[in-house]
């Protein structure tokens, strides 16, 4: 995704469906100087493990 499109998504009043490698994400902010974005994964699976 290019930085202009990512910035449009961040500025939008409606949260569109955005995915990263097929995983739903939320774009929190875009830094156009470094061409990076802060993202959050929307579906995080919790794994419980019991150590012996």
From Swiss-Prot:
Keywords: Sporulation. Its main location: other. InterPro entries: SASP_SspH. It is found in: Spore core. The keyword DNA damage does not apply. One of its GO terms (biological process) is sporulation resulting in formation of a cellular spore. It comes from the Bacteria. Pfam families: SspH. The keyword Transcription does not apply. GO terms for cellular component: endospore-forming forespore. NCBIfam families: SASP_H. Belongs to the SspH family. This is Small, acid-soluble spore protein H.
């Amino acid at each position: 995704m290019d930085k202009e499109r990512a910035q449009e998504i961040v500025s939008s009043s409606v949260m569109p469906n955005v995915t990263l490698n097929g995983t739903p994400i939320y774009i929190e902010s875009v830094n156009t100087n470094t061409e990076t974005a802060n993202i959050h994964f929307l579906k995080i699976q919790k794994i419980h493990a019991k150590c012996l």
